[in-house]
């Protein structure tokens, strides 16, 4: 019997290429989360989706604005996430706002259950994306903001916008001044050179006449 050598087997395994990681593809984000809540800890959760849901999600047809998360019987659920029906789904199409189960480790669910017992703490969906071809949802423990806090956020945004405008205005002024200087100074130098040249020529002519 012919036996395979260990060298040939190892050389074959070394030639097998590693799987290239697919870059993350962000599908939707909850823009109002940072405005309405103070965000604390974040968790990455998987989702149980149907085939028609995955097709419509890959076309970036999804809305997180009205979605919310709650805990029930040691399980985390995502409610009111809007995923529209797919065109080619037919009778197998899904309900656009059905309940969807979030996939988390047991120790993560235990931590979330303890934190949710604190008054004023809730779970908020932040971002929906694909990682290595799998649907993921970034969720966060959050505390609701008051009207005073929201006004402070608006003031900070306005202050940053004004500062950026002032910086742009300062950066634009020197360029305009440089352009005006460049356009004016060469003409003056040329005129001075022409005047000097004409004076020198007239002086030479006078010297020749005297001689």
Curated annotation (Swiss-Prot):
GO terms for biological process: trans-translation. Transmembrane segments: none annotated. Residues 196-211 have a biased composition (Basic residues). Residues 168-211 are annotated as: Disordered. This is SsrA-binding protein. Belongs to the SmpB family. One of its GO terms (cellular component) is cytosol. PROSITE patterns: SSRP (PS01317). Required for rescue of stalled ribosomes mediated by trans-translation. Binds to transfer-messenger RNA (tmRNA), required for stable association of tmRNA with ribosomes. tmRNA and SmpB together mimic tRNA shape, replacing the anticodon stem-loop with SmpB. tmRNA is encoded by the ssrA gene; the 2 termini fold to resemble tRNA(Ala) and it encodes a 'tag peptide', a short internal open reading frame. During trans-translation Ala-aminoacylated tmRNA acts like a tRNA, entering the A-site of stalled ribosomes, displacing the stalled mRNA. Keywords: Cytoplasm, RNA-binding. One of its GO terms (molecular function) is RNA binding. The gene is smpB. It comes from the Bacteria. InterPro entries: SmpB (IPR023620), SsrA-bd_prot (IPR000037), SsrA-bd_prot_CS (IPR020081). The keyword Cytoplasm applies.
